[in-house]
Amino acid sequence: MKPRSLLLATALPLALLGVIALARPDVLRSDHVGMPAPTLSAGQARPADWATPIDPQLRLYRMAPNLYRSALPDSGDMPTLQAQGIHTVINFYQRNDDWLAGSNLTTIHEPLHADRVTDTDVIRVLRAIRAGQNEGGVLIHCKHGQNRTGLMAAMYRMVFEGWSREQALAEMLGGGFGDGELMTDAVGYLNRVDVEAVRAAIDGGSCSTS
């Protein structure tokens, strides 16, 4: 490779990183903690403050009296959801919740890719959860109830319930929501997010942390 070509090959990636750092600082934050143990040890009881299983096949869990998480439901799951008093469904999957057609549930579509979630996405979703809780029970879901749902559930724990990063990650990976190897994108975001900045943005009415 000629010297000029080598210089360009080196400079262009550095310039790109500089642009990303200015436009999306949340993407380049360094990790704060390592990966916690993904499962409970043998004989260890499930922590009382972890999400409570309602329907393991659907990966439906109650996180709080008016907040639930699951994989993608279908119309056959409607009686189960109605029995929990769910009023609002927040969908992170790319497809619309067609299974809700004809129901009286409020649906909010927030399509996300776990490897591209930003602080702005999190702030918007957490506000939607809070608003929905004022009306009744809220269900958050994606396709498998793991990566995207796990990320938002962990952020809810940290921002609104004061959990530590380690506590939120431990529940996400060890709570029975699926294989932790499929949650690496969520873990990456949770390891680098500035929780205090997200909380301050929500409290201050801002749409971003920048």
Q: Where on the chain are the PLM-derived regions?
A:
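Cys-dependent protein tyrosine phosphatase-like superfamily
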Residues: 2-138, 151-210
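Short cysteine clusters
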Residues: 142
